[in-house]
Amino acid sequence: MFVIVDLETTGGIYNKEKIIEIGLIKYDGSKVIDTFEKLINPFVKIDPFIEKLTGIKNNELNSSKGFNSYSADIYNFLKNSTIVGHDVKYDYRVLKNELKKNNFILENEFLCTLELMRECYPGLTSYKLKTLSKIFDIKLVKHHRAMDDAKATLELLKLCNE
């Protein structure tokens, strides 16, 4: 079982990042089983650069629940799966830190579609998610929104598993 993960975060100081949006897709290797998508209040004001990049506004986050309200659901969604992401090490680290603060230990294996695409399709000029989506005609409506990026990442996983 795979769970494709994409996070949007506050950015900033290493290990101080907060999740502002999460998109999860549970995939059994042939079909999507379930999805999970939430805006998450980081309880800090997000930088105008992040607002512009993601389109997520501070006022939207202020009316959302904090990560602790979703931590058990997120942990259970991820349980017994391989976590998949594009440049996954960042998302995995941030997610692991947030779950740890809520007494959940994330020890899942993970798979990086950026590295996978480099192996499956060597010699491309760029392996950024947006570029790969254009090259392989993958629908990416709102880049830097968690669920849209997760959906595009799933399509990259499928390309390498064909």
Task: Indicate residue ranges for each PLM-predicted region.
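Mixed-charge, glycine-rich, non-catalytic linkers/tails in nucleic-acid processing enzymes
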Residues: C160-E162
